[in-house]
């Protein structure tokens, strides 16, 4: 190694990701596919501006906004559940990778178009009126509890610390950042995210095979 100069000191190499600029237009506004599932599923996606590296603040703020709009404490979630329009697992999440960010809503429903319209109406209502202050505080407390709860388990704690470290932050910094988020921040963010012109919808219909499998299991029992 020394003979070939492999032991000599070299300047640190920096990995550079070559990402093509992502347009804010949609590749497709609607798509339907069939899969081996027992009940119809749907997904709504909103294309957002990519978040800079290490910007966990915006990601956390988006998550709090979703909690206010369709979380378990929101009036929309209660209505959808009480009227049987979707399953208990319906909810929203933030998906961010280098050069890309989107906000997703997924669930099971026999009336996905009704759910979509109710969701869009609720987004517009909250955009105009502002997030419910009490629900926002409850969502912040819930998020804070999740951060602390993960520290009680070795595996969860290690995973959480690694995720934050890869973004150049610590758990303590995340907790401080969470404490600094306000309902006014959410109101301001809602003016430029979750825009209907950047929304795409995916319908996933049963292909019939999953129903047959369930019938076979019931027969065996």
Regions from the PLM with identified roles:
Residues 1-11, 84, 121-131:
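A common structural junction motif
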Residues 62, 100, 120, 171-172:
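Residue-level signal for cytosolic alpha-helical hairpin/rod architecture
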Residues 2, 85, 120, 124, ...:
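Short amphipathic alpha-helical surface patches that mediate protein-protein
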Residues 60-72, 119-124:
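Bilobed periplasmic-binding protein/Venus flytrap-like ligand-binding cleft at the lobe interface
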Residues 98-144:
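C-terminal structural cap/anchor segments
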Residues 7-55, 67-113, 117, 176-200, ...:
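Non-catalytic beta-strand/loop surface segments
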Residues 32, 39, 75, 79-87, ...:
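Short acidic/His-enriched helical or mixed secondary-structure segments at domain edges of catalytic enzymes
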């Amino acid at each position: 190694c020394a003979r070939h100069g492999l032991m000599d000191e070299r300047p640190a190499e920096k990995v550079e990701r070559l990402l093509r600029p992502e347009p804010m237009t949609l590749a497709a506004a609607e798509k339907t596919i069939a899969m081996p599932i027992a009940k119809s599923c749907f997904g709504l996606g909103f294309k957002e501006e990519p978040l800079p590296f290490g910007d966990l603040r915006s990601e956390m703020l988006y998550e709090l906004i979703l909690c206010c709009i369709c979380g378990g404490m929101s009036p929309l979630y209660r209505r959808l559940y009480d009227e049987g329009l979707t399953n208990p697992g319906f909810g929203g999440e933030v998906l961010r990778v280098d050069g890309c960010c989107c906000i997703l809503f997924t669930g099971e429903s026999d009336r996905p178009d009704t759910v979509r319209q109710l969701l869009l109406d609720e987004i517009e209502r909250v955009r105009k009126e502002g997030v419910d202050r009490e629900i926002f505080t409850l969502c912040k407390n819930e998020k804070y509890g999740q951060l602390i709860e993960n520290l009680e388990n070795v595996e969860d704690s290690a995973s959480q610390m690694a995720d934050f470290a890869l973004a150049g932050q610590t758990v303590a910094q995340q907790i401080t950042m969470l404490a600094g988020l306000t309902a006014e921040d959410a109101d301001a963010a809602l003016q430029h995210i979750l825009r209907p012109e950047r929304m795409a919808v995916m319908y996933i219909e049963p292909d019939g095979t999953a129903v047959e499998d369930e019938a076979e299991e019931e027969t065996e029992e």
